[in-house]
A protein has these predicted regions:
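N-terminal pro-sequences and low-complexity stem/linker regions of secreted or lumenal proteins
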Residues: 9-201
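N-terminal secretory signal peptides that target proteins for export/translocation
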Residues: 1-9
Length: 201
């Protein structure tokens, strides 16, 4: 019950803020009339993938090509750059097929890895505390070290073959969208919808 009351209060407040903002925009912005043609807003929210994993090569997006060397380098538990990325299997051991990947983003669907777009790669842990450690105060440089899958966290696809890529070309791609909460999908679904954390009353 407390969750429902809090949600209604937040939604009313959000609607009021948006209403004022949209009202002001409708009178001031030159392209505001075009907004009246919008009947639906659909959000496609891809789970268990980073932006760069699917859209890092998307033309015009702030993706892999825009990353600095520091942003592209993963650190080990000792705080020093990893000498190479190890791709760990489901058993937690390095995959002998890929012994010496450089410490940098790499294509999953190209040599030397050559996994098919439809192939399954190990999913990194993304629970609340793991995620905080991986983000490392905003540096985002401990994903390989604080993971059961190692260097897979630095892999990405040429997503141009994905249907989602085509939709991004036709509609809108939010390359500066960031999840609201540490951890998995469910809590972030709640934040996407109501900007709140569910709780028991």
């Amino acid at each position: 019950m407390a969750f429902a009351r809090a949600s209604h209060w937040r939604l009313r407040r959000l609607a009021g803020i948006l209403g004022r903002g949209l009202g002001a925009t409708a009178h001031a912005a030159p392209g505001a009339a075009a907004l009246q043609g919008i009947e639906h807003v659909v959000v496609s929210y891809a789970e268990n993938h980073s932006f760069d994993n699917l859209y890092g090569l998307f033309p015009g997006a702030e993706g892999i090509a825009n990353a600095t060397l520091q942003q592209r380098t993963q650190l080990g538990h000792d705080g020093k750059p990893l000498p190479e990325l190890l791709l760990l299997g489901r058993d937690g051991k390095p995959d002998p097929a890929y012994p010496h990947l450089p410490n940098a983003p790499f294509r999953i669907d190209a040599a030397p890895v050559n996994r098919a777009l439809s192939g399954i790669v190990p999913s990194p842990p993304h629970d609340f505390f793991h995620h905080q450690a991986q983000v490392n105060g905003g540096a985002n440089n401990l994903f390989a070290a604080m993971s059961s899958v190692g260097g897979w966290t630095m892999g990405h696809y040429d997503g141009s073959a994905f249907k989602l890529w085509q939709w991004a070309r036709e509609y809108t791609l939010a390359d500066h969208f960031f999840q609201a909460a540490f951890g998995g999908s469910y809590l972030n679904h709640q934040w996407l919808i109501c900007a709140c954390t569910p709780r028991h009353a």
